[in-house]
């Protein structure tokens, strides 16, 4: 059972006890992502995520790494467009130490100028690595087409230009604005004890909101259709196509997930079978849904040799047109629902996945559903609901990004 406790300062502690395991996973979830940055701040959320590992008042970066290695634990973090998470997984008897180190990083990082300069180079290498990978770059460019005037269209990693402006002062100013108690969830799952929960409250329950804190506002940006093309000397052309879709708050979310599953979400999907299995046009072809607090997107990606790009694109369009015209089949919907239920339940067998699900649900929805409730909602997905989504999503003008040799 998931329990939620709100500290006196507004920090929420979400706990799920799983007594038969010998581990705990804990994550600090912050409602701060790249979409809440100004153009000048682009990339700072991700840069802060890096800098929290670079040393505190009492621990060096090396000591942080060594302490987790010494106990056989794992520590990591990620930044998305809407949130940031710092998380760890350790044996249950090391839970208090793991929480203490995470809290030390969270509250006591020093943002040393020398470390800032070194990590700036590390993130720049990360940016260059992403730009060198056309399968990454094409998705980044696609978001720029979809939302050219909104932070959703900017890269999470930032740019060389914005990175060069970040200092300890700008970092602290951003933290003051967004790392406020009511914007933070500490999620923990596993063999959790009452003493460990009290330890979390002691560490996170008393820090105060900065007077400079701001409320994150959603912009509900307009989706833009259009096309981006980049010429590159590569063996394969990379194609990404995106349609405007629904938000994570939409009650039709499960219908959308089922639609994605049928169109390109697995090996038996329409796109995989037609593009890869029947015609041998691509090794990689898939679709996925991106759902945020106010907007969403349905995206298709495929890569093929440069001479076959137009054939692959025509095949994708033909497949989508058949879905639009004929709808889906009963067996496809049945299989999609069973696959969704199976992947959901199997994914809940680890402490990391439970911690992540609970933290994300609390931060985004402020509520939690049991496994049975989720399965029941998946069972309610119907042909009419999915076909309605087909008519509202797949009939819109898409955004397109292409990277390859001789593309146009």
Residue ranges of each PLM-predicted region?
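M16/MPP (pitrilysin/insulinase) zinc-metallopeptidase core fold and M16-derived inactive scaffolds
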Residues: 20, 25-89, 265-281
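Charge-rich, well-structured scaffold segments of protease-associated domains
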Residues: 6, 17, 63-212, 229, ...
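N- or domain-start disorder-to-order transition segments that initiate the globular core
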Residues: 1-23
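Short alpha-helix boundary/capping segments
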Residues: 36-43, 250-259, 263, 267, ...
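His/Glu-based metal-binding/catalytic segments typifying zinc-dependent metallopeptidases
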Residues: 27-29, 212-269, 402-403
């Amino acid at each position: 059972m998931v329990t939620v406790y709100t500290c006196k300062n507004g920090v929420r502690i979400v706990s799920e006890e799983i007594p038969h395991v010998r581990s705990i996973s804990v994550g600090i979830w912050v409602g701060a992502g790249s979409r809440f940055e100004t153009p000048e701040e682009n990339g700072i959320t991700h840069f802060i995520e890096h800098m929290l590992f670079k040393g505190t008042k009492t621990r060096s970066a090396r000591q942080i790494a060594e302490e987790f290695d010494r106990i056989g634990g794992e520590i990591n973090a990620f930044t998305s467009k809407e949130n940031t998470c710092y998380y760890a997984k350790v044996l249950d008897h090391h839970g208090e130490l793991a929480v203490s180190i995470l809290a030390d990083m969270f509250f006591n990082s020093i943002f040393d100028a020398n470390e800032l300069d070194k990590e700036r180079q590390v993130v720049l290498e990360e940016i260059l690595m992403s730009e060198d990978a056309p399968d990454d770059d094409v998705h980044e460019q696609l978001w720029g087409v979809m939302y050219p005037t909104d932070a959703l269209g900017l890269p999470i990693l930032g740019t060389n230009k914005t990175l060069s402006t970040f200092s300890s002062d700008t970092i602290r100013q951003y933290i003051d604005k967004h790392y406020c108690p009511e914007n933070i969830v500490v999620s923990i799952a596993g063999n959790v004890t009452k003493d460990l929960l009290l330890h979390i409250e002691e560490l996170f329950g008393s820090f105060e909101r900065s007077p400079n804190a701001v409320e994150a506002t959603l912009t509900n940006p307009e989706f833009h259709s259009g096309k981006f093309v980049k010429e590159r000397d590569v063996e394969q052309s990379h194609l990404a196509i995106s349609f405007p879709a629904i938000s994570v708050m939409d009650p039709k979310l499960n219908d959308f997930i089922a639609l994605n599953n049928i169109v390109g979400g697995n090996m038996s999907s329409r796109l995989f079978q037609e593009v890869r299995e029947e015609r041998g046009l691509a090794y990689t072809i898939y679709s996925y849904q991106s759902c945020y607090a106010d907007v969403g997107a349905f995206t298709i990606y495929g890569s093929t040799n440069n001479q076959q790009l137009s054939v692959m694109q025509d095949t994708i369009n033909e497949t989508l047109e058949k879905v639009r015209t004929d709808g889906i089949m009963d067996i496809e919907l049945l299989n999609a629902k069973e696959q969704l239920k199976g992947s959901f339940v199997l994914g809940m067998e680890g402490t990391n996945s439970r911690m992540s699900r609970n933290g994300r649900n609390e931060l985004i929805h402020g509520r939690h559903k049991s496994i049975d409730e989720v399965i029941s909602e998946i069972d309610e997905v119907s042909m009419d609901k999915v076909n309605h989504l087909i008519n509202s999503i797949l009939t819109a003008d898409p955004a397109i990004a292409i990277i390859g040799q001789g593309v146009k």
